Amino acid sequence: MEEALRAWMLNRPDLGKCLIIAGKPEGGVREDGTVTTWYDPTSEELAHALATADTVVCRSGYSTLLDLAVLGRTAVLVPTPGQPEQEDLARHWARAFGFATCSQTELEAGRVPQPAGNPPHVRPNEIAIARLRAWTEIPTLEPAH
């Protein structure tokens, strides 16, 4: 996906500066004209990049979709070839939330749709904290009269 994205970005001068987050543990940064690739960003760098990007093109794995939902971002979803759960998730998010999708083959051919959709509105930390409190509260027992 990285090379296909880089080729697409370099052929689209209208996109301006672009950032690829490859998520590979070897670290480092690669510069190719207007395209920068981060190989091992911190959580803070990743959140800032997603929050401030004009366009997000990403895989449709569970953790990526959770990041998009928490940040309230739309994206073009590109399922990993041969990963049926990512294909199912991309189809579901396209139907349920209007997200744009394309296949790896379409990405490699430079046929990337405009991002679209309305991510689900979630407040996971508030919900999790409320549930945790409810599960861990010890009820006070009133003395029997």
Across the structure, where does each feature detected by a protein language model lie?
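A general structural signal for well-ordered secondary-structure junctions
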Residues: L15-C18, V56, F99-A100, N118-H121
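Short glycine-/small-residue-rich Rossmann-like dinucleotide-binding loops
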Residues: G61
